[in-house]
Regions:
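A bilobed periplasmic-binding-protein/Venus flytrap-type ligand-binding module shared by bacterial periplasmic
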Residues: 19-29, 115-133
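A ligand-binding cleft/hinge motif common to bilobed small-molecule-binding domains
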Residues: 1-7, 51-56, 77-112
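Bilobed "Venus flytrap"/periplasmic-binding protein-like clamshell domains
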Residues: 17-72, 90-94
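Ligand-binding clefts/hinges and TM-proximal coupling segments of bilobed small-molecule sensing domains
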Residues: 47-66, 102-107, 136-167
């Protein structure tokens, strides 16, 4: 949703999405600044790639940013020690760790935290965004949203902390 709030009518945010950095469990890398001079792998065309290639003030000077079409390859590269870190969607990294027994550690500081919502045309007159927002609020209140998200994520509460986005 971020940066596109005025382009659409939005229902949400209803979930929190975090882009994070993962390193080997035994790595001495503790924060993003420790990645200066290191090699990181990212998925091509993803948010981490855009952030790292833009070189903002909080982005360390990497030795190399490797952009890959298949995110599974970036995880395998970290697992084999070919790169010092990977960056991507937190839940995708956690799922890889679970599925393959990978011993990664996710840095505490997220690279990007954003809300996920449902977009409707700005010109829509059916009131769907408002209706869906109301239904999602009811689902949050009665616990059914956590139950639903819990079918797909190990710790659904992290993804449901949308109130944190406004702080």
């Amino acid at each position: 949703m971020d940066g596109r709030e005025n382009d659409y009518q939005w229902a949400g945010p209803y979930l929190v999405s975090r882009q994070v950095i993962a390193v080997g469990a035994q790595s001495g890398i503790e924060q993003m600044s420790d990645l200066a001079g290191k090699t990181i792998a990212v998925q091509a065309t993803g948010k981490p790639e855009a952030i790292f290639l833009s070189g903002g003030e909080n982005v360390p000077a990497f030795r190399n940013v490797i952009s890959l079409a298949d995110r599974g390859v970036q995880y395998a590269m970290l697992d084999c020690g070919y790169v010092d870190a990977v960056a991507g969607h937190e839940e995708a990294i956690r799922q890889y760790m679970k599925d393959y027994g990978a011993n990664f550690r996710i840095l505490d500081e997220p690279l990007l935290t954003t809300g996920i919502g449902v977009a409707f045309s700005r010109h829509d007159t059916r009131g769907l965004a408002a209706q869906l927002t109301e239904v999602v609020a009811q689902m949050r209140e009665d616990g059914s949203m956590e139950q639903l998200v819990g079918k797909y994520l190990e710790v659904p509460a992290h993804s449901l902390e949308v109130e944190q986005l406004e702080q």
